[in-house]
Design a protein with these regions (language model features):
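N-terminal secretory targeting modules
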Residues: 1-55, 59-65, 75-81, 114-116, ...
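Conserved SGNH/GDSL esterase-like catalytic core that processes O-acyl groups on lipids
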Residues: 46-54, 59-140
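Soluble non-cytosolic domains of exported or imported proteins
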Residues: 61-65, 132-140, 189-196, 240-248
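Short aromatic-enriched loop/helix-cap "lid" or pocket-rim segments at secondary-structure transitions
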Residues: 66-67, 98-99, 168-172, 227-232
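A short helix->loop->beta-strand "cap" motif at the edges of active sites that frequently abuts
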Residues: 152-155
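Short, solvent-exposed beta-strand-terminating loops
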Residues: 159-173, 222-223
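Substrate-gating cap/lid alpha-helix
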Residues: 168-219
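Histidine-centered active-site loop/cap adjacent to the catalytic His
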Residues: 231-267
């Protein structure tokens, strides 16, 4: 009898510890990062060269193969030497992207920020939407990303959350991930299949903070007006990432915005 009580007590204790541990993980997963204050090592910028960095998620990571093309486009339009560097993390949410801005080495983008580029293209949001992080968490960390860039004198170029086949993403995920996302959807009150609320929330954030004049915002409809359904030719077979044609179209749109902005600014 005593042995059974001991066994039951041990099992109960293990369950309790497991629940507490899961609770801490859950809390950390949805936690809001605090703003990190960084002191730049470099305080000078090469006025003869337009420097553009592309940071964020997988769209930034895979753009590295097209850096030379974007560089050529900008140089042809703006008539100034241009440097383009892309570095992103596949699957990164805005929280991770912000933290990477303060990390040196292969896993961070701090070294790119400290180049003091003229522009920083930011691709973020699709992974927040898929993981159901909620618009509050998404906008909080996106706001920190924008503030970090502006504090360094870098103009953000915000790429609106793209039109992709989100259902195709879910279909490829393991059952555990699907369950986790449904729980997250319930916890954050984020719709399971609708992602327009993330776009709307980001637009409102930019307007409310009155920073819309300090950045460039590129709606997805501006470079892909037909939307995902009629633009399969722009995406890879995974239904999520741009192929070469997609990047060429996006780069053309980015170039136009940089040309317009640089025409009104003297670097």
């Amino acid at each position: 009898m005593i042995r059974k009580v001991i066994i039951i007590s041990i099992i109960f204790l293990l369950l309790l510890v497991s629940l507490i541990y899961i609770g801490f993980i859950f809390r950390d997963y949805f936690s809001f990062s605090e703003e990190i204050v960084s002191r730049p090592r470099n305080t000078t910028r090469n006025s003869d060269t337009i420097t553009v960095i592309f940071i964020g998620d997988s769209w930034a990571a895979y753009h590295s193969q097209n850096d030379q093309h974007l560089k050529t486009c900008i140089e042809a339009k703006v008539k100034k030497p241009t440097k383009v560097i892309s570095k992103g993390t596949v699957g990164a949410k805005t929280k991770t992207i912000y933290k990477e801005m303060h990390i040196d080495g292969p896993s961070g983008t701090k070294e790119l920020i400290e180049l003091l580029p003229n522009y920083a293209i930011v691709s973020a949001g699709i992974n927040d939407a898929v993981a159901k992080m909620g618009t509050d968490n998404y906008c909080h960390h996106y706001s920190l990303i924008i503030k970090r860039l502006l504090s360094a004198g870098i103009k953000p170029i915000i790429i609106d959350m793209p039109q992709v086949d989100y259902r195709a993403v879910y279909q490829r995920e393991p059952i555990i991930a699907k369950i986790r996302h449904r729980i997250s959807s319930w916890y954050t009150d984020a719709p399971l299949w609708t992602f327009e609320n993330y776009r709307t929330a980001l637009r409102l954030l930019i307007r409310q903070d009155e920073i819309n004049n300090l950045l460039i915002y590129i709606p997805s409809s501006e470079w892909n007006a037909e939307g995902y359904a009629d633009s399969r030719m722009l995406y890879k077979d995974d239904h999520v990432h741009l192929n070469e044609n997609g990047y060429l179209l996006l780069d053309s749109c980015i170039t136009s915005h940089i040309y317009i902005d640089s025409s009104s600014n003297l670097y």
